[in-house]
Amino acid sequence: MKRYVLDEMIWPEVDAVREKIKMVVIPTGSCEQHGPNTTFATDTVRAYEFCKLLGERMGDQILVCPPVTYGLSKHHMAFPGTITIRPETLVHIYMDIVLSLHKHGFKKFLFVNGHGGNRTALTMAVAELYETHGILAYWTGMGSPFVKDMFAGIVDPDQPLYGHACEMETSQVMYLAPWAAREDRKKGEIQDSAYSRRIFKDGGCPVNWRTDASANGALGDARKATAELGKKMTEHILDEVENLILQLTEKNAEKGSKQNS
């Protein structure tokens, strides 16, 4: 099926299809270290390549935007190369993208988020878009909540920290963008700190990753990652997000913004 990716189009092509488009999809990522395992493009390229595959499934039902390549990554600033954006700036960027496209006649918008640090800004942006402008915007993740059972027996649930440059994330990169994954992958060098205590898994504390979380910037064991797992993971999440879009674009869909993490 023909995909509609803004980066690959000229304006007359957008003009010709815009009345058919039911949902604009906006990938969000980061420029953030992922240890010795995957490049700074990890979050962005995962989200963007995922959305392109979604476009191949859904054709002229969706328009895939260029990715937002920066995010909130303050907790990774101990590692050279990481770039972080202030939350209030991110909110404005997300809103301005939607407001621009809404002016061209597009009605509904879904951010597909590849970086956990963006969650708060995305939630604030979609709420403000609806409350102030009456625009229906949503966001969803593309990570472990969808595929947790798939990695049973591969991810050690008893390890103190995991979930960054790990078995799951690295597998997805190996499938979606193999150029962004290194062959000589390393296990995370977890630090003995307050951050590695279980009580903070669903909470928070001040973090300097180099001293409090991981000496090499990875959490989990990327040595177990495979492209095959990444493909299986991606196809499952594609099913979930495609179904989400179909639900959100039904004629009788209720008004109001909704966030799915």
Predicted regions span which residues?
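Extended, histidine- and acidic-residue-enriched regions that form the cofactor-binding/catalytic faces
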Residues: M1-L110, G116-S261
